[in-house]
Each structure stands twice: as C-alpha cells, then as structure tokens.
Amino acid sequence: MIKEKRKVEVIGLELPIFKGGEQINLSELIAQYPIEDGDIIVIAETLISKLEGGVIDRDKIIPSKEAIELAKKTGKDPKVVQVILDEAKEIVKVGKNFIITETKHGFVCANSGVDESNIYKGIKILPKNPDESAEKIRKEIEKLTGKRVGVIISDSVGRPFRKGAVGIAIGVSGILALWDRKGEKDLFGRELKTTEVAIADELASMANVVMGEADEGIPVVIIRGANVPFGNGKGRDLIRPKEEDVFRN
C-alpha cells in the first residue's frame, strides 16, 4: 500500500508593488503571515534591490567609450551596458544581445544580473551583499515571531548547455546552502562517497515556480516541511572557485 511520507508546502505571498526607494520594513511585512518553526522564506532579489536602493536612474548614466563599443557588438542599450560593466569584475563572453560576466559577488551570469523587468523606472542591479541582506531579514523575522527560520535571496538565471531560466540562491542565512551528505547510507546501505547537494538552489527553484517571471506579483514564498538542516550556510558557499572551473581553465 502506498502511503504519504512527506508533504512540502510552497506558499506564495502577495505584497504591495514597490517602485523602489520606499521606506518599508520588509521583515515586519513578512512577519504578518503566521510563520512556523522550520519555514524557509525565499525572497526575490528584485524586491531586495528595490528596497536597498539598487535601482539606477537612467538619466544619471553616462556610457563610456567601452560601453558604446560593446553596445554596438551586442545590440544592447549603451546605458544598460555601462551598468553591466560597472557591476562586473570580468567579462567572460560577449555575443548578440548578451554579455556573460563574473560579478563583483563572484556570480557568473548574463549581464551582471542587471535587469529592467518588473522595475517601474530605471535599471536594477543585484543586491550589494545578498548574504548580509538574508542574515538581517532572518534575524529580524526570528525576533518578531519567535520562530527559527531560514532565508534565501533568489534570482533566476540561465545555464550553460540547457535552455530556460531557473531559480538559484544568491543569499542564504540560517540553513545549509551546500549539504554534504558524504558518509550517509543509500537505500541499500551503501555509503555515499561524493554527494553534495546544492540545497539552497533547489529551494530557490522550488520557490521560483510560484514566484513566476512575469506579472504574478509574488516576491516572497514560504517553503514549509522541507526538512532542511539549519546551519551557517551562505550563498557564496555555492560559488565554485575559479581555479576549480574546468570550463574557464
């Protein structure tokens, strides 16, 4: 007989639409929902950027010569290219309508994470320190609710060799980001030798199904029942060191 073994809930929270720069305590808003012990709170990075002043006024952007030349090669707006360059540590690859960069955070992604989607006016950059943002929000929510939670700041990115975007964790607090399961046993009692699970990325992708990419208006998702280990994980734990990157070496 088949029986239920575990149930995981993914709960999307609708918040007001923010244009950027509002003086809002996000933790207090989220804490209005009945949070439970063990909840994982996933927050879209766009919302964090808006509230942390990460939306740049287009009128204040003056494209450099490099940005103008790169805009010609890619077909992108020179002002957008300038912001991409400002947020990049290294340009990895350039093509028609894309610039793959390594950001100052160490993320390798398209366009340094710079985006204009779901932005009222201006150009959005990634949060300056997503791990720090996640930590601050987690501590505030735990203080407000008395519950132990994890917080993930998520972004959606494309992947090499596969089509489509998926959610990933760029900021993490309160849970493991990378779950090392070496030494545990499989179903047949064999010891796991190399298994590391990017559990924070998996949770971010789960949340992204509910958040969506268009006009869903769900920037915060609660994942309940996932049974994820608490810990001191960080989003940066998921970044492969450049010297271990077989594609760039």
From Swiss-Prot:
Pathway the protein contributes to: Cofactor biosynthesis; coenzyme F420 biosynthesis
Alphabetical UniProt keywords: GTP-binding, Ligase, Magnesium, Manganese, Metal-binding, Nucleotide-binding, Potassium
InterPro entries hit by this protein: F420-0_g-glutamyl_ligase, F420-0_gamma-glut_ligase-dom, F420_ligase_CofE_arc
Temperature dependence: Optimum temperature is 60 degrees Celsius. Thermostable. Retains 70% of its activity after heating at 80 degrees Celsius for 15 minutes.
Cofactor dependence: Mg(2+); Mn(2+); K(+)
Listed SUPFAM superfamilies: CofE-like
Cofactor annotation comment: Binds 2 divalent metal cations per subunit. The ions could be magnesium and/or manganese. Monovalent cation. The ion could be potassium.
EC number in record: 6.3.2.31, 6.3.2.34
Source organism superkingdom: Archaea
Class of the enzyme per the UniProt entry, highest EC level: ligase
pH effects: Optimum pH is 8.5.
Reaction it catalyzes: oxidized coenzyme F420-0 + GTP + L-glutamate = oxidized coenzyme F420-1 + GDP + phosphate + H(+); oxidized coenzyme F420-1 + GTP + L-glutamate = oxidized coenzyme F420-2 + GDP + phosphate + H(+)
Binding of a divalent metal cation 2, residues: S156, E213
Binding site for a divalent metal cation 1: D115, D155
UniProt similarity note: Belongs to the CofE family.
Function of the protein: Catalyzes the GTP-dependent successive addition of two L-glutamates to the L-lactyl phosphodiester of 7,8-didemethyl-8-hydroxy-5-deazariboflavin (F420-0) to form coenzyme F420-0-glutamyl-glutamate (F420-2), with a gamma-linkage between the two glutamates. Cannot use F420-2 as substrate to add more glutamates. Exhibits maximum activity with GTP, compared with UTP (66%) and dGTP (25%); with ATP, only F420-1 is observed as the product; CTP and TTP support no activity.
Quaternary structure (record): Homodimer.
Name of the protein described by the UniProt record: Coenzyme F420:L-glutamate ligase
Organism the protein comes from: Methanocaldococcus jannaschii (strain ATCC 43067 / DSM 2661 / JAL-1 / JCM 10045 / NBRC 100440) (Methanococcus jannaschii)
